[in-house]
Amino acid sequence: MILLIDIGNSRTKYVQLISGELSATTQLNNSEFSAEYFTKYFNQASQLIVANVAKSALTDELATWCAREKISYKQVHSEQKKNTLISAYQEPTTLGIDRWLALLGTIHLYPQENVLIIDAGTATTVDLLTSNGQHQGGWILAGINALFTSILSHSTLVHAKSKTMPSLAFGANTSDNVNNACWAATLGMIERAIEQAQQLGDINRIILTGGDGKALTRLLLAQTTENILAVENIQFIDNLIFFGLQEYA
């Protein structure tokens, strides 16, 4: 059994890879990371494959434990090329590992398709992948929560509470004004990305992932999609990153 591990800024997710199939996802706070946890939950693994966007101390601790337990350990990094995927970055290692693995995961699921990938988490990223595996680059925007807190932190006169229900309606109070504008701005960026991508060639599929990806998928599907893409080709894929990590197994 191989463990695929995604270490985020505050939380870690992992899945088991058994005979080519991914298990359900387990999540934990990074504060729970310890040798005791590893021994309890990871000691049956033959290999750990890790992606990390957090402090290196977490992976250092995990690598040390693996060495002691004689378990194979591999931390993956963004590259210029992997399989058929070619990075658009002039300095490939500076592409976020989460974006790199989302691109790899997309090729794993949908080879030889032109795909627009939107990952909506701490940041909302857009990446265009063409059918020959060429990454065409993308955009990075502050995530929904970051947009919200940025407005409040730069104005002492705006008082609003974050709401979990996304809406594009014009608000009749400050909280709705701020919340709905954050969703509208993000959706507007996505729609502009779709238009720009289509100018470069036909798009076969739009994939959304990340913590806010499901809500954005619903908002996107609620808009007029006739000129965007067939509804069945606009989809949310939870934990797309693990399909990318699987390529390193």
Swiss-Prot record:
Gene Ontology terms, cellular component aspect?
cytoplasm
What does the note under cofactor report?
A monovalent cation. Ammonium or potassium.
Primary subcellular site in the record, as a coarse category: cytoplasm
Q: Which Pfam families match?
A: Pan_kinase
Q: Which residues bind substrate?
A: 89, 96-99, 174
The molecular function terms of the Gene Ontology recorded here are:
ATP binding; metal ion binding; pantothenate kinase activity
Ranked from the top, the taxonomy reads: Bacteria, Pseudomonadati, Pseudomonadota, Gammaproteobacteria, Alteromonadales
Q: Mind telling me what this protein is named?
A: Type III pantothenate kinase
